Amino acid sequence: MTVLTEGIAPHGGQLINRIATAAEKAEFLALAEKLPRVSLDERALSDLVMIAIGGFSPLKGFMEQDDYEKVVDDMRLINGLPWAIPVTLSVREEVADPLKEGNWIRLDDSEGNFVGVLELTQKYRYNKAHEAVNVYRTDDQKHPGVKVLYEQGEINLAGPIWLLQRDPHPQFPKYQIDPLQSRKMFHEKAWKTIVGFQTRNPIHRAHEYIQKCALEVVDGLFLHPLVGATKSDDVPADVRMRCYEIMMDKYFPQDRVILAINPSAMRYAGPREAIFHAIIRKNYGCTHFIVGRDHAGVGDYYGTYDAQYIFDEFEPGELGIVPMKFEHAFYCTRTSGMATTKTSPSLPEERIHLSGTKVRELLRKGELPPPEFSRPEVAAELIRAMQGS
């Protein structure tokens, strides 16, 4: 099912809706005990939700082999539409063997709740090493995305899905805004141009600077932190959200910013994930997307601006969303303000950069990072979280 939308066209032209109606849900629930079951981990469950609400439009389900291979090799679906990350449901061979193509499969969450169904159109084996090198640019299993890839099952189950059950987010129900809702909100605010910002980290001054630079040239900012699965050493989502709320209350014009959660999981695929994140924000109704330094990167696997260069591999207008590329921002002691090398005449020793590692070290000690790096209220919130208070 597709739905009519406001504003910029979703990826592929139509916003997908795979949320079962009450009648459809009743039909599937009547079959609940008869259907073979597959249990979803946190990432697969978030993918199910994102497909169903249209965040992954034009996908209607988990990828069949032709789409999967085309995406891995060429960053396109088989119909030629740009798409950078494979969206698959991978299971062990012993789970896949008894499943028959053409049948419905019951999808359960980790607690055994019946959350969705998959119409199994195909099951296929895939090459993990090939996917790792093409998508993540490495087969090093120390890379968190590659690690997940090598730990998951060796058979992909493909086919359209229906979402049967989705509870309000247990921590952030008021920020659970789906693509149809965000588009309606943008329309009601009369925003014609909207820039999306992806983050898995608390907002620091450099982020604030580039967001406000972007806000100078568009109508609204869609602040869209990711709350799906992340690395164990990333700042927990509840802490990050409290930091975003502080920023919204004190440092942003509230009539020009919308804060919402992004339920999808991180892949840490760097450049390819930047494309993926841009397409997701396009589906939510954004016309522009901020791409900063090492977007969706981890460690030293990607170059500082590789996630910006990858947008140049597509023809102008082909992605349907405008990347706003920003250099690494810093605090300039000469000009007493945030800047980049494009706007500051400063020497390297006049630029204040703090690594995430250094900041975490300060926070664990209960020490506030310098105000040039973080707003004091945000730093205080992070200290409370790091010290368990």
Curated annotation (Swiss-Prot):
Question: One short Pfam family name for this protein?
Answer: ATP-sulfurylase
Report keywords, A-Z: ATP-binding, Nucleotide-binding, Nucleotidyltransferase, Transferase
Annotated protein name in UniProt:
Sulfate adenylyltransferase
Query: PANTHER family attached here?
Result: PTHR43509, SULFATE ADENYLYLTRANSFERASE (PTHR43509:SF1)
Q: Which organism is it from?
A: Microcystis aeruginosa (strain NIES-843 / IAM M-2473)
Q: Name one GO molecular function term.
A: ATP binding
Indicate the family of this protein: Belongs to the sulfate adenylyltransferase family.
**What's an example GO BP annotation here?**
hydrogen sulfide biosynthetic process
Q: Which reaction does it catalyse?
A: sulfate + ATP + H(+) = adenosine 5'-phosphosulfate + diphosphate
Lineage top rank: taxon: Bacteria
* InterPro entries, A to Z: ATP-Sase_PUA-like_dom, PUA-like_sf, Rossmann-like_a/b/a_fold, SO4_adenylyltransferase_pro, Sulfurylase_cat_dom, Sulphate_adenylyltransferase
Give, as in the UniProt entry, the pathway in which the protein acts. Answer: Sulfur metabolism; hydrogen sulfide biosynthesis; sulfite from sulfate: step 1/3
Q: What is its EC number?
A: 2.7.7.4
